[in-house]
Amino acid sequence: MRNRVRVLKKRANSITWRVRVQMMTRLDPTRPNTTLYDSAPRRPTRLDSTRLDPSQPSSHSLRGSPSHFVVAFSRGRGRIGSLDCAANPTDQSETGCDGHNKMKDIRSQFEKNGFVVLEDFFQPEEIDELKSCGEEFTTNLPPENERKVFNTLELQQNKDKYFLDSGNKISVFFEAEALEDNGKLKVHPRVSLNKIGHALHWLHPTFKKYTFDERVKEAAFQLDYQEPAICQSMYIYKNPGIGSEVIMHQDATYLYTEPVKLVGFWIALEDATQENGCLWIAPGSHKSGVHRRYVRNKDPESKELLVYDRAAPCYQLSNFRPVPVSKGTCILIHGQVVHFSYPNKSDKSRHAYTFHVIETQHTSYSKENWLQPPPGGFLKLYRN
């Protein structure tokens, strides 16, 4: 705690960015037959007082108009210093500006919806620097004999081992549609990669600089993280035409702590739209627990080193809302909120940099997780 206070005192000026508040369909505890997901052949799980409302039309349109707030953080007090409405004053009753009653700070919105949109989190020139570094990886690809395509059960063990070994490295992951079986590219190198992971935040100087930036520390502080640590990082390409779908999931499935205290920082390096594969999030779904785990396989005879502990839930698509954002925006994603993205079939890429932060104080990180800490532990956010 003393270290955190000392770090905060070093900061000179308050940070200002824009928090976007979208009036979406939220939890409806009055509907007794509402379910978040059905998982055959098991009986649908009921969510009691934290149900989602599936009665909304399936067009996925947003209710109401997005509104914006300028948030100036008071570092010394560790809470919001001021909250000024930047939306149309006539819309205050709908957007929640009236008296600051509905949306007072980042934490209240995060706890209510399971995510927060912070616009202008990084400046355009900073985003361009990150994107330039991401594009450099496409000019220095591994040799063909190291570009592996894992498409059979026999090779599943090799796939899992490569994934496990990537935790403390900068590893290259290709798009499935980018390679022939022999490793030759079917597409231009610039659009061949799915992602780079999982230790960019420490092993690459530029990504390290922005991961441990004061704005990141401030956001974690606002979410009441006492001793946060960065456990993984990824550069996501979502290339035009072949950018893969990301299935509906919770981040806590893969990075489980007890109790769960996990937040993802998802930073848009380009405009993310419905056309090029923006995130879709189910507001309030973080209140429904962890639906399944992705763990190390205890069966020594199995070809699979990593397995899910239960079948995939069947989520209702009507519960999800698109979250299109502009370049430079950061979305804070609760570890239990369900989210996904469609394949990118457009002619525009959708690059993003993302990393995950866990609480290390009064929590335990599961030894069953695919990603395990290095000998010295995960890197502490406030101390670097």
Where are these regions (language model features)?
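Non-heme Fe(II)/2-oxoglutarate
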Residues: 140, 144, 167-169, 287-299, ...
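Short, conserved beta-strand element in jelly-roll/cupin
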Residues: 256-273, 324, 356-359
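Polybasic, lysine-rich low-complexity intrinsically disordered segments
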Residues: 3, 9-10
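Double-stranded beta-helix
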Residues: 272-337
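Non-heme Fe(II)-dependent double-stranded beta-helix
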Residues: 85, 92-112, 119-246, 379
